[in-house]
Amino acid sequence: YKAFYPGDKVKIYSRTDLSELDGVYTVDSTDDNIDKKTVIVKFKEKLPPMKPEMYVFENITYNPNLTVSGCTFNAIPTRGILCTTDKESEIFGNTFKSVGMPDIYISCDCRDWYESGPCRNMKIHDNTFSKKDPIKFEPICLLKPVKDVHRNVQIYDNIIAE
């Protein structure tokens, strides 16, 4: 699949600490026909001086808003919900039972998965969880300490029924 198309909007993050470079960049053109794993992307704007291997480029054009409501997550061996969108997100009115990993996993990973960006403007409320640590936040960074990655996350009015 093509990761970038002309006109797409891109944010740039440091691979070491997940900090975001200022600005949103617009794809001008791409060359995907290199070796099935390399893409050359040209931007309309001038990029700041950088070593490309130290940064990841996230195409934010198709990042969705997320609403998960009225669902039951039961007997799932992995996580219930994995959220990595920077758009509006709301998870409410759900029941989580016997989920093997975190019920809700808020990730940001520039080390292994590459498509995982930070969460912004998220609400988690009025859910019922069956374990005491149901929500996991994990920016996976190469350096410590970790800078703020996720922002404006509100967690309230949930029930934890062990």
Put a short name on every predicted segment.
Residues 1-34:
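Ser/Thr/Gly-rich low-complexity blocks that favor extended beta-strand/coil architectures
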Residues 12-24, 44-60:
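C-terminal effector modules of nucleic-acid-centric enzymes and ribosome-associated factors
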Residues 54-58, 78-80, 110-115, 139-145:
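Short, recurring structural edge motifs at helix starts
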Residues 59-65, 73-75, 82-85, 96-97, ...:
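Low-complexity, polar/charged sequence tracts that form flexible coils or short amphipathic helices
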Residues 77-84, 100-107, 131-137, 162:
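Short glycine/acidic-rich loop motifs that flank beta-strands on beta-rich extracellular proteins
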Residues 95-132:
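Long amphipathic alpha-helical scaffold regions
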